[in-house]
From Swiss-Prot:
This is Enoyl reductase cheB. Keywords: NADP, Nucleotide-binding, Oxidoreductase. Belongs to the zinc-containing alcohol dehydrogenase family. Pathway: Secondary metabolite biosynthesis. GO terms for molecular function: nucleotide binding; oxidoreductase activity, acting on NAD(P)H. It comes from Chaetomium globosum (strain ATCC 6205 / CBS 148.51 / DSM 1962 / NBRC 6347 / NRRL 1970). Its EC number is 1.-.-.-. The gene is cheB. It comes from the Eukaryota.
Length: 377
């Protein structure tokens, strides 16, 4: 593959004052270090953390955003990835730690992205950039850390658990929820672990299509009790993407008599659950790359070479599943207005207007909707 003409500056969505986000022109390109790749962004997916993190930890002038898909246009040193070194022209998708106070130009909401070689995926020839971004590597990383590190769920994709266990994935119609359902089913022998989930009745068929075994209406006043009954008072594992008072109450009350583990993907109130037999943990997907998080309080995490080693192997496992078409993507809604639509999409998420869809913004009309196969013809 030939070389690409790379500008000295580009456009990016940066943090403004008070946690706001602004479109900035003529921003210097990210600086590549060892193990980095420069990616020309074709599409990005939007996540709630993309507006929540800048609001909670504002750093004016810093980059923002996590999920991306695009084309490798420049290489840092040591760019080895499972399957061989990355090359100029490779199609790539992944997640980076956006709004990172320790790395100002780390963020996906930009024309060019600084990706980490060992924490990125190759896009299969049959997949478009929008579809790749819509798989939401940010959610893949977060759910992986939640299920297999925080909850310590038995089984792996390569060696599924022989005994099926009940697992509650709250909010199965969310993008992270639908990924969680599929991961639970893929790590149990034959039919997988038994996945319980919640959502609105209008989305029951959707979550069942991802493999959910039983679905409950989260608005039902007896939701927790119904889950307890369905799991014979033996539920031990619960993932809560929202960490709200109501969602935490349902999850922790659904856990059986013997207790278990609860993983929240958002900060939760400790006093909502007083059950000493339920171990509670705030899970952050950004720790998968092993660097420490110095955000203060419960958001602080130490540097962990062990987590980094696990994360590298996790990415290899996910790549094999993606290549084998084992993941069914979440329904995506593509916005084609570039950075303006990026801001509007984040506002839509903030207003909670999106249900059972993943918002993806196309940044490069020339490659929108194209696969590697279609560009070769």
């Amino acid at each position: 593959m030939g070389s690409f003409e790379i500008p000295e500056k580009h456009t990016a969505l940066l943090q403004g004052e008070g946690g706001s986000l602004v479109i900035a022109r003529d921003v210097p390109l990210p600086t590549l270090g060892p193990g980095h790749l420069l990616v020309k962004t074709a599409a990005v997916a939007l996540n709630p953390c993309d507006f929540k993190t800048p609001a909670a930890f504002p750093n004016p002038g810093y980059y923002n955003g996590c999920d991306f898909a695009g084309t490798v246009v420049a290489l840092g040193s040591d760019n080895i990835r499972d399957g061989g070194p990355w090359k100029i022209g490779d199609r790539i998708f992944g997640a980076i730690h956006g709004a990172n106070p320790s790395d100002w130009d780390s963020g996906s909401h930009a024309e060019y992205v600084k990706a980490v070689s060992v924490f990125s995926y190759r896009i299969p020839d049959w997949m478009t950039f929008e579809e790749a971004a819509g798989l939401s590597p940010c959610c893949i990383a977060t759910m992986g850390v939640s299920l297999f590190k925080a909850l310590e769920l038995p089984g792996t994709f390569e060696e599924p658990a022989t005994k099926p266990l009940d697992v509650l994935i709250y909010g199965g119609s969310s993008s992270v929820g639908s990924l969680g359902i599929q991961m639970v089913k893929l790590t149990g022998h034959r039919l997988g672990h038994r996945c319980i989930t919640t959502c609105s009745p209008k989305n029951f068929d959707l979550v069942k299509s991802y493999g959910a075994d039983e679905v409950f209406d989260y608005k039902s006043p007896t939701c927790a009790q119904d889950i307890r009954k369905a799991t014979r008072n033996c539920l031990k594992y619960a993932v809560d993407p929202f960490g709200e008072v109501k969602t935490m109450a349902i999850c922790t009350e659904a856990i059986g008599r013997a207790g278990g583990r609860y993983s929240a993907l958002e900060k939760f109130q400790e006093d909502v659950c007083d059950r000493k037999t339920v171990k509670r943990e705030l899970t952050m997907g950004a720790i998968i790359i092993g660097h420490g998080l110095d955000l203060g309080g419960r958001y602080t995490r130490p540097h962990s070479p062990e987590m980094r080693a696990w994360g590298i192997e996790w990415y290899k496992s996910i790549q094999r599943l993606v290549d084998a078409r084992k993941f069914k993507p979440h329904p995506i809604r593509v916005l084609k207005g570039g950075f303006e639509d990026m801001l509007e999409g984040l506002a839509m998420l903030k207003r909670r207007e999106i249900s059972a869809e993943k918002l993806v913004v196309s940044l490069d009309p020339a490659v929108s909707g194209l696969t590697a196969d279609s560009t070769a013809r």
